[in-house]
């Protein structure tokens, strides 16, 4: 192969012409980082400064890259017994406000992520002694989500904010969560939903 073959592909061979398709991309670098964790901490610091009602700063971390703020006090501060099951409503979003998941139908509709095939209702959480063993509707969750739940007690409402090492890391998740994205989860412990 040489440059002439690449620039002038055969015109009569339909099987090879697709591999010679050209594409032009116009890219703009909007931000860069020498250290991705420092970049995420700076983004979270900016979020805290732009949302002063949270009353958080980067100095308030409970663990590297993890922040929790109680929004409504619990009715009981007793720690859950291992293997207890309780129910939560939650909304997950990015620092820019993009909602990517929720158990609330109105929130889903308001943010363009509603799916008629999904049931919007509180979901069960299985408590565990070690937060990494907490399960949501029988499935494992990212560490930051589990850490947020581990801070909570009966009927409490709170928000967990954490860097990507406690979320989806470099890979992101689906089309909504890019790699290295700090995440926000607003979670409320609620009563078990009525069976229909």
Please state what every model-predicted region is.
Residues 1-196:
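Cross-family detector of peptidyl-prolyl cis-trans isomerase
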């Amino acid at each position: 192969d040489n440059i002439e073959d690449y620039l002038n592909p055969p015109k009569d061979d339909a099987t090879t012409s697709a591999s010679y398709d050209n594409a032009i991309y116009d890219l703009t670098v909007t931000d860069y980082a020498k250290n991705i964790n420092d970049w995420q901490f700076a983004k979270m610091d900016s979020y805290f400064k732009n949302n002063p009602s949270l009353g958080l700063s980067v100095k308030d971390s409970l663990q590297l890259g993890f922040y929790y703020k109680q929004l409504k006090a619990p009715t009981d501060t007793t720690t859950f017994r291992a293997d207890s099951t309780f129910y939560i409503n939650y909304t997950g979003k990015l620092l820019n406000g993009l909602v990517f998941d929720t158990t609330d139908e109105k929130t889903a509709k308001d943010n363009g992520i509603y799916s008629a095939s999904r049931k919007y209702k509180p979901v069960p959480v299985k408590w565990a002694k070690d937060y990494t063993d907490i399960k949501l509707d029988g499935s494992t969750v990212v560490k930051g989500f589990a850490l947020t739940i581990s801070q909570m007690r009966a009927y409490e409402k709170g928000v967990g904010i954490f860097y990507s090492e406690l979320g989806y890391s470099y890979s992101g998740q689906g089309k909504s969560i890019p790699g290295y994205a700090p995440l926000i989860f607003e979670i409320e412990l609620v009563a078990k939903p009525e069976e229909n």
